[in-house]
């Protein structure tokens, strides 16, 4: 077994760790194994990182062979017991269950007892569709934040490297193995600022204004869109763009400017009346009017309105809205869950900030198949 220590001088927390625990009680951990199935694979490396008065210290417990698995587990347990909170990336799903299973095989009672698990991946998960629509691997977050690596391998690729190392140890293989693990541990320290983006949910926004824009798509068809401008006081490390099928958001970390681009729909909509019993439907005109007005017409001209026929048609230009914020609420059909409002007639500045928040919040409640 080898224990490899390194100090990154003057490294300080990049996010307020105190939100979770005292800084000195936080231990970042990452493990390397010969496979995903804990019952048939072995643990060969446990990496740790923690803050000291001098900086960020890493400590790696490396098993020269599979026979040293119990040794690195025991050494890690003795070291980790000084910390109350373990930080990891998707560790609730893999690292922690794996470690506990292996500790159980060696009758290590009290292994990681009373430690609090802080899964950075779980904390970041609400940002999935705002920032990481393709993948939310740790390396993807590092790339987004502009964090570079010396390591050129994945954990899966290093399995073969370790298996070859067990037979014929080389300095290069050893360096590749520990570099990958150390950079995973160090990377967790570096990606903590990603948590600042969680503040975008229900974020306070200042409405600046809007302007419209016309453009032609690749087929030559002309479209019109509206671009809303907001400002935010939220601090975040990198500018970003996010989009759904019909919305585009651009946020600048330099000045807090947020632009939200929405398509303008030029089509016929319908406004449905909840109090449909107070209306009559006129089939020839395809519209509903109040009973008091209908009764002045010949009986053959009207019929009792139903939920499906108590509507009036509206022509004009419209914007989609996540909630029934701007009235009247319009739709293409009663069963259509999408809501619209007349734009610019029914848009009001007093509700503009709430409108902007509701649009950004869409990214925090999206599901894999959702579209907006």
Regions found by a protein language model. Name each.
Residues 46-48:
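Short beta-strand scaffold segments in enzyme catalytic cores
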Residues 1-29, 34-41, 51-372:
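DEDD superfamily 3′-5′ metal-dependent exonuclease/proofreading module
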């Amino acid at each position: 077994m080898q224990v490899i220590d390194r100090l990154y001088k003057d490294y300080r927390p990049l996010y307020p760790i105190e939100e979770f625990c005292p800084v000195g009680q936080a231990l970042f951990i990452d493990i390397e194994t010969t496979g995903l199935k804990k019952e048939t694979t072995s643990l060969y490396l446990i990496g740790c990182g923690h803050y000291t008065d001098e900086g960020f210290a890493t400590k790696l417990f490396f098993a020269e062979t599979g026979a040293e698995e119990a040794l690195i587990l025991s050494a890690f347990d003795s070291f980790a017991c000084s910390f109350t909170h373990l930080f990891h990336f998707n560790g609730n799903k893999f690292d922690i269950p794996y470690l506990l299973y292996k500790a159980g095989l060696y009758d290590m009672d009290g292994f990681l007892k009373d430690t609090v698990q802080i899964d950075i991946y779980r904390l970041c998960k609400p940002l999935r569709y705002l920032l990481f629509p393709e993948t939310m691997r740790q390396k993807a977050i590092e790339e987004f934040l502009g964090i570079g690596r010396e390591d050129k391998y994945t954990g899966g690729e290093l399995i073969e490297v370790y298996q070859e190392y067990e037979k014929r140890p080389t300095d290069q293989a050893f360096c590749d193995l520990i570099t990958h693990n150390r950079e995973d541990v160090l990377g967790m320290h570096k990606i903590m600022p990603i948590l600042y983006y969680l503040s975008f949910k229900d974020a306070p926004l200042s409405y600046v204004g809007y302007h419209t824009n016309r453009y032609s798509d690749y087929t030559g068809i002309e479209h019109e869109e509206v671009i809303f401008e907001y400002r935010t006081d939220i601090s975040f490390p990198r500018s970003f763009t996010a989009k759904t099928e019909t919305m585009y958001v651009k946020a600048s970390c330099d000045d807090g400017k947020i632009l939200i681009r929405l398509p303008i729909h030029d089509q016929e909509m319908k406004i449905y009346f909840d109090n449909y019993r107070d209306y009559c439907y006129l089939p020839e005109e395809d519209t509903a009017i109040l009973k008091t007005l209908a009764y002045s017409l010949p009986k053959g001209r009207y019929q009792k309105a139903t939920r499906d026929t108590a509507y009036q048609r509206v022509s004009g230009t419209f914007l989609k809205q996540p909630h029934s914020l701007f009235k009247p609420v319009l739709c293409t059909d009663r069963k259509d869950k999408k809501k619209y409002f007349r734009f610019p007639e029914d848009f009001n500045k007093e509700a503009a900030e709430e409108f902007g928040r509701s649009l950004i919040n869409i990214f925090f409640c999206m599901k894999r198949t959702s579209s907006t």
